[in-house]
Amino acid sequence: MSGRRIKLRLSAALVAAGALVALAAWPAYLSGKTQLGSRAAAAVAVKPDWRVRDANIAFLESRAGRVRGDMLTPRMLATEYLQRYRERGDIGDVQRAERAARRSLAAQPRGNIAGEASLAGVLLTLHRFREAKAAVLRARAWRRDDAGLAAEEAALDLELGDVGGARRIIATFPEDTAFDVVAARLDEETGHLDDARARVARAMARADTIYDTPAERRAWLHARSGELALEAGDVAAAGRATGEALAIFPTHLRALTIAARVALANGDLPAAEAQAQRAVAIQPNPEVLGLLGDAQSARGETAAAAATRDVLLAVARIGDALHVNDRLIALWEADHGVRVDHAYGIARRDLAVRDDIYAEDALAWTAARSGRWAIARESIAKALRYGTHDPAILRHAAEITAHLDASDLSPAVIPRIRAMAAN
């Protein structure tokens, strides 16, 4: 399996990382209950909020610490830092956001709902999911009926592999638009891809009518729409959606990554290489480096592909002290037969952090590639237990079941696995 099939999963969070919790920080975006009519409202102009991000941060930094007991300024700083991370990919901004959020909570430990939500967004981005859920639960203790906070808890349940818990929370808020993105994630994991696409389309259309929606958030939704379209095999729709995302925010990392995958699916190698290069310039993570190397290799650019591979290996060897790229590194190493025992160890560590279907898939694939077939069989069965249609998981399942019998798998998934194996 090539690097292009590595998928950066964000839950509500995504994606990228921290998407749902981030969205919950924008009440106008998530908390409204008004449904779109039969005809979607016209999209409004994009707010160029990223242009004043540095100025906003500089101003807030100049005010921080001036007033004893100030909980508002550090909380606002945390929000701005985290948003700048999503726009530019500097993990240092996430660390700054954590310090700011904790200063806000130190100033007002009780009832600081926004401070807890900010901290949860940071911790989710850092893949410290259990700590993030604890912060959300503290916030919900003060505001139990808040749909945005409930959506955050459901998103974290999905990250932790608690599909039942997420489903129960979502059912408590039927038809609330605050849940469109996280419910779409649930639909995706449980094999209801058409429903997932419809929910994201509704969230996207709604966000596009609200001027105060951050440009990066709007682009993320269009990119997410493209990701789901690509997962469904609708390459044309995926291309349109990523084009829209990049028109909204031209340097959106997730949109560029998906655009590179779309170009590879279309056989447009120059475009795939160009989009991957743009993504690498923002954040050289294992996924985009893998895509770039694939495109370069396919174009016969041997020296460039070797250089990209060296960079990726350096990233994998140095590792990520914060472990936010663990799964990507494990999958890339397994795909390319590089340090497969190391990849398996990373996948085991990732599973201990969040036991969702993608963690089980990563463990299954790294186990298979390192010859641990019994573990591969057990883990791929867990990855498939909710009926996902994810092509990468099905491809892994096809290769694993080719070496083992499929008696542990649900009969419903066998035809999809066989179809994937035939292709």
What are these regions, as identified by a protein language model?
Residues 53, 87, 91-94, 129, ...:
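TPR-repeat structural position
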Residues 63, 103-104, 138-139, 169-173, ...:
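Canonical positions in the second alpha-helix
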Residues 71, 108-115, 142-150, 174-182, ...:
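Generic helix N-cap/helix-start motif at coil->alpha-helix transitions
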